[in-house]
Amino acid sequence: MKGGNAWALCWREGNEDLMRKATAARNAQLASSQPAREENIAAIVTHLRAGAKAECRRVGIELEHICVDGTGDPITYSQPNGVRDVLAALQEKYPEATVHGGDLLGVARPGAAVTIEPAAQLELSAGPFENLIDAKRVFLEFEDDAYQALSPIGGRALTLGFDPVNRAADKELIPKARYDYMNEYLSSIGPWGPRMMRGSASTQISIDYADEADCIAKMRVAQVLAPLFALMCDNTPVFEGSRRPHALMRTEIWKYCDPDRCNSVPGIFDEGFGFEDYAAYLLDVPAIVALDDDGEARYDTRTFGEIFAHRAMTDDEVFHAMSMVFPDVRLKSYVEIRPADSMPIPYVLAYAALIKGLFYGKSSLETLVRSCAGISESDVAKAKDALMESGYAAEVYQRSAAEICDELITLARRGLPAAEWYFLDPLAELVARRVTLADLDISTQ
């Protein structure tokens, strides 16, 4: 056994040496064909370093809602009393309007922005919050505001992972060129991109990082745990008008949506991975949408590196490139954790508490960093497949998924202030029962 392990180690080290040489050759080729590449990598890295925030324990929360009328039909953007009018009604309390081409596309106030996703899913992005009681207040207030704005047509803002009635292809896109171009490009890959755009709704949690090392450590842990977060937050009982074929439909949607920009960030687990590697990843992704000289969207399937081969990117162009990748864990000026379905507010707050306790509790994060050591992108992909097939009964990373989730609840509680422990309870109860919100919905049908 020892001899076999030694041989395997030599083989792996030999392969790593070959990979390093191949990477160096590719980088040299890219530098030759993209003279501004190093300057653009530096511009992206500068932005990422500027995002570092020492001693912060804040969470940002984004929650998407699927708007339907009293019959379950989608409420479109442009219909009478549609989502455009919902935004107009919300403007009384969220007075900062985003208007493009005469279309109202978002409203905001300090600390809270209401925007719309491709098929008019209503999203509240709020925070960052130092404490969860403030998050609870903001989200409950928005829930009441949305209810009032939708009441003229008996509408509802559903917190589910996928439209429970309508097929994605039948849903209207909002008037935004970015989404037209994304729909065209992703449709050429398969049906999953349009399903993501039109049918899905999510919960996303963002966390701060202190420096580059802290950022990469948090990204790696979040990537390893992403399949388990998806399980704990699974809230898609219905998919494309029928009972779902298996658990974690959001995971499957993103698995096949576009391999160039989804799933794990390539190389995230490689020794030495850092901001420069993430910047190179951004430059090597097909843009789909680029910005012209007036800041307007245009269709472009070249990579960002090719588009900006001969000049430095502006800040707006850097921000845009960051928004055009959709991995499980995305980096901007914060770490964005993306695998969870949209959920009712008590579960959103529980999920935020889970993330806060795991990633800001010093001993909890240190425990997770040790536990995640040696896990690869392939291991994460296998974990997703196992959880889609077997849920809590699955084995992932050579352990029981259910037992890992138990430990995550314990570690999160350890990392939270005692005054916020109770926020974890809704999610902890689901984990203890080995069920998801989707399971509970299916069991009542």
What are these regions (language model features)?
Residues I66, Q204-S206, E336-R338:
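Structured core elements
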Residues G155-L158, F162-R330:
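Loop-rich catalytic cores of soluble enzymes, especially ATP-dependent carboxylate-amine ligases
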Residues I288-S378:
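Structured mid-domain segments that build the active-site/substrate or prosthetic-cofactor binding neighborhood
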